[in-house]
Amino acid sequence: MNTEATHDQNEAQTTGVRLRNAREQLGLSQQAVAERLCLKVSTVRDIEEDKAPSDLASTFLRGYIRSYARLVHVPEEELLPGLEKQAPLRAAKVAPMQSFSLGKRRKKRDGWLMSFTWLVLFVVVGLTGAWWWQNHKAQQEEITTMADQSTAELNADKDSGQSVPLDTGAATSQDTTPAQTAPAPATPVDSTAATQTPAPTAAATQNTVVAPSQANVDTAATSAAPAATETPSALPTSQAGVAAPAADPNALVMNFTADCWLEVTDATGKKLFSGMQRKDGNLNLTGQAPYKLKIGAPAAVQIQYQGKPVDLSRFIRTNQVARLTLNAEPTPAQ
């Protein structure tokens, strides 16, 4: 009768109550049990209160309860009915295995994506090359057009310049005539020769200028000698009065190492030069600053402005037509 009553009493007690009673009979505290089982005191308390922590898997909880039962000498078989209620076993969720075809589809999709990426890359590279080639071709056409224009302008200048020698010759003849006739009045004139030449008109006046000189030569050779000596003495005086022009501080000096097309315009819009310069040539231009320059081959020219070299490296690196403006810098006071 006593055995059956004890068995019924054990069945009425839960797992946590039985473990707590066994611990108290052995005189152990919750701290001591936790240290022996290497558990937290809160975990031991939850087991004795028949609580299942939400963050603890049922498999670990059943293992802790069995270790606790062995520690307090409680048979595990007597705790099995309570374990099923307190820590029931749950079926593990197993993800279904993916078929091999899914991996193949993913690999195929990655292959298409890679092919599309390469296609886009090739298109971008092709467009970039086409853009560069168009710019290069446009620059070459612009240089050719400018060279043709400069050639046409040079031909026009040559055609218009054929009349220049005639004008200069006429001007020199007009200049030399007063120069030749100017010394004539300075020569001594006899009164008899002067009375022989009438002066009613301008033509007669010219004859009177020539006649005294001839009469002077015929009558007295000694009077021609002072006139001859006076003429050379006047030449140094005229030469001394001519001074060399001062160098323009805003002058452009250019030296060419190869054939190059060039156009230079000053502030007034006047074209100081437009045409082709040959290798080993040099050019010195003066005008009103600032100057606007257009150079077909920047690497073929060296420019000095106000005694300083002009940097054209940025145009040489890009191999393009140089368009730049040179501003006048104030010169320091002397």
Curated annotation (Swiss-Prot):
Look up keyword Isomerase and say if it applies. no
The family database entries (Pfam families) matched by this protein are listed as: HTH_25, RodZ_C
Give the source species.
Answer: Salmonella typhimurium (strain LT2 / SGSC1412 / ATCC 700720)
GO CC, one annotated term: plasma membrane
Q: Where are the transmembrane segments?
A: 112-132
Q: Which residues bind DNA?
A: 30-49
Q: Where is the HTH cro/C1-type domain?
A: 19-71
What remark about domains does the record contain? Answer: The helix-turn-helix (HTH) motif in the cytoplasmic domain of the N-terminus is involved in the formation of spirals to maintain the rigid rod shape. As this protein is anchored in the cytoplasmic membrane, the HTH motif may contribute to protein-protein interactions to form the RodZ helix, which is localized beneath the cytoplasmic membrane. The C-terminal domain may be critical for determination of the rod shape by probably interacting with enzymes required for synthesis of the peptidoglycan layer, including PBPs in the periplasm.
Please state what the protein is called. Answer: Cytoskeleton protein RodZ
| Alphabetized UniProt keyword annotations | Cell inner membrane, Cell membrane, Cell shape, DNA-binding, Membrane, Signal-anchor, Transmembrane, Transmembrane helix
